[in-house]
Amino acid sequence: MSGTVVAVPPRVARALDLLNFSLADVRDGLGPYLSIYLLLIHDWDQASIGFVMAVGGIAAIVAQTPIGALVDRTTAKRALVVAGAVLVTAAAVAMPLFAGLYSISVLQAVTGIASSVFAPALAAITLGAVGPQFFARRIGRNEAFNHAGNASAAGATGALAYFFGPVVVFWVLAGMALISVLATLRIPPDAVDHDLARGMDHAPGEPHPQPSRFTVLAHNRELVIFGAAVVAFHFANAAMLPLVGELLALHNRDEGTALMSSCIVAAQVVMVPVAYVVGTRADAWGRKPIFLVGFAVLTARGFLYTLSDNSYWLVGVQLLDGIGAGIFGALFPLVVQDVTHGTGHFNISLGAVTTATGIGAALSNLVAGWIVVVAGYDAAFMSLGALAGAGFLLYLVAMPETVDSDVRVRSRPTLGGK
């Protein structure tokens, strides 16, 4: 995965690979592992677990758009990544020591704010390093390494949890965060073109729009529709894995964390090739048909979970998450870049749409936790699946294809092979 795929020196490409690999576990947070830890070790109920999960999401929602604006303006993008990783590490170390509802809520808020740095900063560093011509392929590679990192961290967590219990999730997260700091520092400061990183597209000396004006968000119809679609996607998706983790833990109390790791590894192994293929073919195939496949798979997954609570079935269905999430992760920054290219508003727009994903995720955990308490797990899964179906229809009807037709023509293989 090198050579023509990235237009950067090998050292920078390798640093980006390691950064995406090590940040995988960090930028996603503790997620379902925290649910299992609180359920098994501290006997929390599902509603309380859903509440603290939502707190982290809400904190990220509040921080995401301002942080996107900051990433647009600053040339210290590496420092932002380092600061976020250090804060996530500190929160992960503190959670087992302060496990009350108030303490976990505060630490989840810190984690949510700190982790909101990673999506816009990584996308900006990537765009500034490779430019728009190679962005789709490099994002696919980023996501492939991200999913490989998630699978590796989950495998390590599952193995260690077998011997030391659910508390190891905090150790693994802290370790990956520290590795991400080292990877960030391996990217030379002059490797990133900060005009390209915020979505500028102009010749030297030409005037260009000022970046990060909030009014651009409300007037970009495609960006608003895409934001609504990703709210639906994450509302449907975010709570599914934590709910599966709770089911596995309830039926296998001694192996809940290890089984959750199996779920994550299974999905992440699928995501690696999916993300890479999507990144290499998104220009030729277009964004819309691929995104619709992601919505369709998510819809099916929600209903399939209700057919059995057998551990093997649940882990097997979780493989579908590898398709849906692999597609979403690779296409998400590409669509935002498509609809904001040349404006200088890439990172604030990415931050705003990431805020939409946070809204969806926070609502997902909060509402799904309440549905489980009131009506059970099957009702929660069916509700989430139905919402994914609604998102499919929204994207099908309202969202146009965003990749330029000339780009699609240039990206299609010829009869000669390339």
Swiss-Prot record:
Keyword Cell membrane among record annotations: yes
**Keyword Transmembrane applies:** yes
Q: Can you say where in the cell this protein is located?
A: Cell membrane
Q: Name one GO cellular component term.
A: plasma membrane
What residue ranges are annotated as transmembrane? 51-71, 79-99, 110-130, 163-183, 224-244, 258-278, 289-309, 315-335, 356-376, 379-399
Membrane topology summary: Multi-pass membrane protein
Tell me the keywords, alphabetical order.
Cell membrane, Membrane, Transmembrane, Transmembrane helix, Transport
Question: Could you tell me the superkingdom of the organism this chain comes from?
Answer: Bacteria
Similarity field: Belongs to the major facilitator superfamily.
In its UniProt entry, what is this protein called?
Answer: Uncharacterized MFS-type transporter MT2531
Instruction: Please tell me the species this chain comes from.
Output: Mycobacterium tuberculosis (strain CDC 1551 / Oshkosh)
The taxonomy runs: Bacteria, Bacillati, Actinomycetota, Actinomycetes, Mycobacteriales
